[in-house]
Amino acid sequence: MALHRKAEALLSERPDIAVISECARPDILAKRGDTALSNCSRLWMGTNPNKGLGVFAFNGYTVARFEPFYPTLRFILPVRVDGPRPFNLIAVWAQNASAGVTRKHQSGPLRRSFSKYREFINSGPTVIGGDWNSNKIWDKPGWRINHMAKVEILDGMGIGSAYHAVTGEPQGEEKTPTHYWRDRRIDGPTYHIDFVFAPNAWLDEIRDFSVGSFDDWVGNGLSDHVPITIEF
């Protein structure tokens, strides 16, 4: 939340495409003076005007929502990205199933989106990125919502994780966190729950990859998450 406090840090990354969770609606950003974020090509979905999923395009890129769109998949946004290198994007701020043990019977919105948007995903190179709110460390035997169930589905579609392709680390053994939970301390509970998946052919073309540092994003109070930045 409070994207207006983070805009300068975000724009300093000079992104072509930015996927931002817990993001205010663009008209609210405009009222707060965030002209760079409110005047660019952008999309937003959510039920709380101050806390949704935003996609912002810069540097000659534009974004348009793919139709048909299924807003009940909270919050999964299918996006056509046009520009110097067009591609499809599934922007993610996954609101995973709850209710304790009953989760074993629920697939969750992100996994369901792979079926709902399969034609879209298959229509061209597709990047799937954002806050997945999941990791192999929480998987339970036979549960449909498992993180690895989603990873395996995407693997069958020729789509893999950029972080794991670059680092060689196994799923569930990530050494670099993306989320500093609760007390936002570098030695507190930390997790790797933000991911960018891309076509395997693109993973071979990664020119630059980074995970934001604690000091730049969390230690100074900007966020409890750090960004993943990729240049293909």
Where are these regions (language model features)?
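Structured beta-strand-rich core segments of catalytic domains in phosphoester-bond hydrolases
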Residues: 17, 21-97
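Short, acidic/polar
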Residues: 1-11
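Conserved beta strand-loop-helix elements of the APE1-like EEP
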Residues: 48-64, 82, 173-174, 180-205, ...
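Metal-dependent phosphoesterases centered on the DNase I-like endonuclease/exonuclease/phosphatase
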Residues: 17, 108-199
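Surface polyanion/phosphate-binding segment centered on an Asp-His-Pro turn
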Residues: 217-232
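Short catalytic/ligand-binding loop motif for oxyanion handling, primarily in non-cytosolic enzymes
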Residues: 26-29, 52, 97-100, 135-139, ...
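Surface-exposed cleft-lining segments at the edges of enzyme active sites
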Residues: 65-67, 93-111, 136-141
